[in-house]
Amino acid sequence: DISLSIPQKTTTAIVGPSGGGKSTLCNLIARFWDVDSGEVTLGGVNVKDYSMNSLMSNFSFVFQSVYLFADTIENNIKFGRQDASHEEVVEAAKKACCHDFISKLPDGYDTVIGEGGATLSGGEKQRISIARAIMKDAPIVILDEATANVDPENEKELMDAVDALTKEKTIIMIAHRLKTVRHADQIVVVDKGRIVQQGTHEQLMKQEGIYKRFVDARQQAVSWKLAR
């Protein structure tokens, strides 16, 4: 059983062991799956009472595995809002820190990319997906390990892009990276399909549990100390 409230315009980080239920929880929130019992509500309304188009208009998604269409970069970004002008596409790309590398491509925004975006690096593909989400401008953003496989050179630009996307939004974030979760308004620890801990970073560090072990293991692995 899970009971969770996510206030509007806050950041909720979901952490836990692999297979513990993090992705399942996000799938239920967005109604990719339906609950067997109980209910999931959005703004006090059961998600089953929304039309699928109406429900999806409330969400933007940035997944670890990015899918791009075999089309121009501009059309890939405009997928977030089909009626967007070229100027609006460029503005979204600038916010997502991908305008510079797009401008260097042979045909700029008219460059056709292969199915899956094979001609782009992982960080570039993720920034285009973030530009798409910025274009959509949905009130709720679900980030599924969006920075997990990014090389150090691209990480800062990607994090800047995520910051641009998440301003004034309700954020639900699955992540393994400590620095992306420690400033969340609430951290939810999921294990074996249950919420086993919930609170802020400071609160959870005072408890003996999965979260403290998660933090201690990462500090030991990379020999860093959290900024006080």
Role assignments for model-derived ranges:
Residues 1-228:
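ABC-type nucleotide-binding domain
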